[in-house]
């Protein structure tokens, strides 16, 4: 955004005056929601030296979208625990607004930016009560809707960070990815990919391998160019989890049934070490265990960087079992 085009505090207050309902608010506030967020715009929203605290000035007299724009800007700029604690009470008041659901559906970008700002500041400022805020947003958006919203991923991230795995599992099991609305609830496909990746991680943690694979397979199968980071991260785990569960991985045609040759080639390049590991893993020949160990040692930094070393080690521990099962299948073919 060019400097001369930056909005001012006066223009924000004027926009707030024009916001009489959800429709007029969403139209008037668009200039104050750049993607990605911009500090200069946040400063304009909050007023000189953040003294305006504009959210408190009109939270009762305007649609909730107006103060939520303020809260998103304020949370992004938090610098102290005291400031974080002071946000909670007025924010909760706005989140209890009777028309909040209809308002949130008018500005999905605002919802996404607010949710991600809360999740990103959560570890720095426990007084922000991030999980409570995100749960409240999630419940409002999930009213009579079972698909993924743009609050799902930040909520799961915070629940995992605070070791609330049972609650995270409930969110995942209560969500039907096939019912996702990519207009009102989830306009950014990246939010969907992030949810699929995190849901897969949660299912993996509780030992629900089939559900984890379903999440990650879905992420990998989306035809995006280029492949996104969460897709590559999901594929790496698909390969390892299939090795852990089955002892091998299917062909590329089976693994990527909806992707063209270019997309498959990109995935193979991005996840080359994992495909090599799978190839050696499935070769039950003399010396292959040592070769596998050497591969893991040589690629240890990559596995650690991908946070998959734990899963790799589990695969190595399960390999003798898969080798025995493979021999049993061979013996059954003898006359």
Where are the model-predicted features located?
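Alpha-helical scaffold segments of alpha-solenoid architecture
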Residues: 192-199, 204-335
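TPR repeat positional signature
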Residues: 111, 115-118, 134, 152, ...
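Residue signature of alpha-solenoid helical repeat architecture, marking inter-repeat boundaries
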Residues: 105, 109, 145-146, 190, ...
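Eukaryote-biased activation of long, low-complexity terminal tails and linkers
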Residues: 2-125
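Amphipathic alpha-helical segments of tetratricopeptide repeats
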Residues: 92-100, 135-142, 172-184, 217-224
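TPR-repeat structural position
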Residues: 84, 124-127, 165, 209
């Amino acid at each position: 955004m060019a400097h001369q085009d930056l909005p001012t505090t006066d223009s924000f207050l004027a926009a707030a005056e024009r916001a009489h309902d959800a429709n007029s608010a969403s139209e008037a506030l668009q200039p104050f929601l750049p993607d990605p967020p911009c500090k200069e715009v946040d400063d304009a929203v909050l007023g000189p030296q953040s003294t305006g605290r504009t959210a408190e000035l009109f939270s009762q007299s305007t649609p909730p979208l107006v103060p939520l724009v303020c809260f998103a800007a304020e949370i992004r700029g938090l610098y102290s625990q005291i400031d974080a604690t002071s946000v909670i009470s007025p924010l909760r008041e706005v989140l209890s607004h009777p028309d909040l659901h209809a308002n949130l559906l008018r500005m999905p970008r605002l919802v996404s930016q607010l949710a991600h700002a809360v999740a990103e500041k959560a570890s720095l400022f426990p007084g922000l009560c991030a999980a409570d805020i995100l749960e409240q947003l999630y419940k409002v958006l999930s009213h009579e809707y079972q698909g993924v919203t743009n609050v799902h991923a930040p909520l799961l991230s915070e629940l995992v960070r605070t070791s609330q795995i049972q609650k995270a599992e409930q969110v995942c099991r209560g969500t039907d990815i096939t019912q996702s609305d990519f207009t009102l609830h989830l306009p950014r496909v990246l939010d969907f990919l992030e949810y699929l990746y995190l849901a897969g991680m949660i299912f993996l943690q509780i030992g629900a391998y089939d559900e984890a694979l379903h999440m990650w397979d879905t992420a990998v199968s989306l035809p995006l160019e280029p492949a996104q980071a969460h897709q590559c991260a999901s594929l790496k785990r698909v390969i390892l989890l299939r090795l852990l569960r089955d002892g091998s991985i299917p062909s590329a045609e089976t693994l990527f049934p909806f992707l063209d040759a270019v997309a498959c080639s990109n995935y193979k390049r991005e996840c080359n070490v994992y495909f090599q590991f799978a190839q050696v893993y499935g070769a039950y020949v003399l010396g292959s265990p040592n070769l596998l160990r050497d591969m893991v040692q040589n690629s240890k930094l990559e596995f650690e960087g991908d946070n998959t070393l734990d899963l790799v080690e589990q695969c190595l521990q399960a390999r003798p079992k898969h080798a025995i099962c493979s021999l049993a299948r061979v013996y059954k073919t003898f006359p």
